[in-house]
Amino acid sequence: RYIDSFFRPFLKGIFLDDPEQVSASMFRFVFRAFSAGDAAIPAAGMSALPKAMRQALKPGTVITGVQVVHVDRHEVRSADGNQWTAKQVLVSAAHERLTGQNIPELNKSWRSVLNFYFEAKTNPIKRPILCLNANPNALIGNFCFISDVASTYAPQGRHLLSCTHVGEASWTETLQHQVHAEMAGLLSLPYDALIPLKHYAITQALPAQQRVSPEPRLLQTENGIWLAGDALANSALNAALATGRLAAEDMLRV
C-alpha cells in the first residue's frame, strides 16, 4: 500500500515514467539525495542557477536567445547569419540535429510532461509540501503551492499553484478544463477559485532512465565536436554539470 500511495506517484513525478521502467541505480541516487538534504527552489526562479554561473564570466561571454543552425569543429553559425569561431566547440543539446551525425551512445528516448500553473485566491494546504495523487486514473500526478516554498513566486495575498500531468505533452482546451476541474476538486475549491495562468508542454523533458551510465561519458564526434549533457549520462542536474565540467577539462588539455 505504501508503495502505491507514496513511492509510485512520487517517483513518477521525478522520472516522468513508471518506476518499474527506471534503473535501480537512479532510484538509489534520488532516494539518497532526498534523504541527505531538503528540496528547495531558488527565490528568483530556476533561471537564477545559470545566471549565478554566468556572473563569474566576462560580460558578453554568454549569448542567449540565438537559434543555432550549423556547428562544426571550429565554427558555430546562427539563423541570423552571425558566426563564431573557436579552437574547439562543445554541444550539450540537440546533439544529432546540430552536428548532423548519428550518435549511438546518445539516449534518444525521451519522457514528456505538461505543467499547469494557476493563481489561487485561497490556499487550503498552507504548508510548503509536495502533494501526491495516488489515483492511477487521475490527470494530475502531483501539485504544490509553490509560493509557500518561495514567497517571491506570488504577490502578497495570492498563491501560485503548480500541478503536473505526466504523459503525452499535448495540450488542448479540453484537457485544460479537465485539469482545472480535477485540481479544484482535489482542493475542495469552487472552479472559479483557480485562475489559469500558463501551461508548458515539454516533449523532451527528461531522457528515459531504463539504463543509465554510472559515469558520465565523454564523447567527440568523428569531426571533433565535443558532446556533453544529461542524455549522455542520467537525467539529473548533476549529470549535466558533470559532463560539461569533464568535457571542459579534456578540452583544455588538447
Where are these regions (language model features)?
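Active-site/ligand-binding neighborhood in enzyme catalytic cores
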Residues: 1-75, 86
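PAPS/PAP-binding and catalytic site of the sulfotransferase fold
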Residues: 49-56, 90, 179-185
